[in-house]
């Protein structure tokens, strides 16, 4: 089912930048970012078959994908790279030098090195890598801009860096990690070292941390009176979180600061294994 959410025309300009989540969670991640002329994937942490099926559900053909942008080398972000690059021999893979060290043996495609803070263009989409704080080798998130509309994807970070925060403030659509509930994590059956890793500055964002960050974003946001930003909660843990808990916690944090979902910001949660709506940015 192909659903376009949000606005298709902003200030008299046709908006073509759009986003769809094919999978988002600790078991696998893959996102579609596209315009009418350029088709990108961010991460390939699920099977090539599921990627192709997800793209079809979003009205996009696998053969139209021009580039894969990889955030880091963890399995839930790169599991499908080998079959994907085998099936698309002309695919370009963008990642940092640190990430490439871990995935080059699995990747038959052309590699293009990126670095945080150094923007580049793919077709009519400007891509802006930024630093994440995660237990990986040179991980990055990505912000995308086309025709003045901005989408930022930030997951797998123990905290929001200043660089990332500035990009969020400028974004029309925010894909933001809301990985775990701290209390649920502390009392789950994970080994102590795993809990400590997740809660560290090199782990993942909790529901409460995400709520606080959204308040800061709204404090500084530059949106006009006729527009509210949209946030999509991403990378939820299957074991230590669920959508209703994430949304309730974040709403509570925001309301304590005078911000309300539906009035100041639109919010939805991305599924771990179901293709999302297609969002106009």
PLM features: residue spans?
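Conserved beta-strand hairpin/beta-sheet module of binuclear metal-dependent hydrolase folds
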Residues: 2-58, 139-156, 173
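Structured catalytic core of nucleotide-sugar glycosyltransferases
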Residues: 21-30, 71-77, 81, 91-93, ...
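Active-site environment of divalent metal-dependent phosphoester hydrolases
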Residues: 27, 75-78, 100-102, 137, ...
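Active-site neighborhood of phospho(di)ester-bond hydrolases with catalytic His/Asp-centered motifs
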Residues: 41-45, 65-73, 94-97, 152-156, ...
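Active-site metal-binding motif and surrounding structural segment of the metallo-beta-lactamase
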Residues: 48-95
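Metal-dependent catalytic neighborhoods of phosphoester/phosphodiester hydrolases
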Residues: 79-88, 104-106, 241-245
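Metallo-beta-lactamase
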Residues: 95-149
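Cap/insert and terminal regions of metallo-dependent hydrolase folds
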Residues: 163-266
């Amino acid at each position: 089912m192909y659903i376009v959410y949000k606005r298709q025309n902003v200030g008299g300009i046709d908006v073509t930048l759009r986003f769809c989540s094919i999978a988002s969670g600790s078991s696998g991640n893959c996102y579609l970012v596209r315009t009418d002329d350029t088709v990108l994937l961010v991460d390939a942490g699920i099977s090539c078959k599921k990627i192709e099926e997800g793209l079809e559900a979003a009205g996009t053909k696998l053969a139209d994908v021009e580039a894969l942008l990889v955030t880091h080398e963890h399995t839930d972000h790169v599991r499908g790279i080998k079959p994907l690059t085998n099936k698309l021999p002309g695919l370009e893979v963008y990642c940092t030098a640190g990430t490439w060290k871990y995935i080059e043996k699995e990747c038959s495609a052309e590699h293009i090195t990126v670095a945080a803070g150094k923007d580049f263009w793919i077709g009519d989409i400007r891509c802006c890598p930024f630093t994440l704080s995660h237990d990986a080798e040179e991980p990055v998130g990505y912000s995308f801009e086309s025709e003045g509309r901005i989408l930022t994807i930030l997951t797998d970070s123990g905290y929001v860096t200043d660089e990332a925060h500035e990009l969020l403030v400028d974004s029309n659509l925010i894909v933001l990690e809301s990985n775990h509930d701290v209390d649920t994590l502390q009392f789950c059956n994970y080994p102590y070292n795993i809990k400590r890793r997740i809660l560290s500055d090199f782990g993942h964002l909790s529901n409460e941390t995400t709520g606080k960050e959204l308040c800061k974003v709204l404090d500084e946001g530059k949106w006009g009176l006729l527009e509210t930003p949209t946030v999509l909660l991403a990378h939820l843990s299957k074991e230590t979180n669920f959508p209703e808990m994430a949304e309730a916690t974040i709403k509570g944090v925001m309301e304590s600061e005078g911000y309300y979902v539906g009035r100041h910001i639109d919010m939805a949660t991305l599924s771990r294994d179901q293709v999302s709506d297609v969002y106009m940015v």
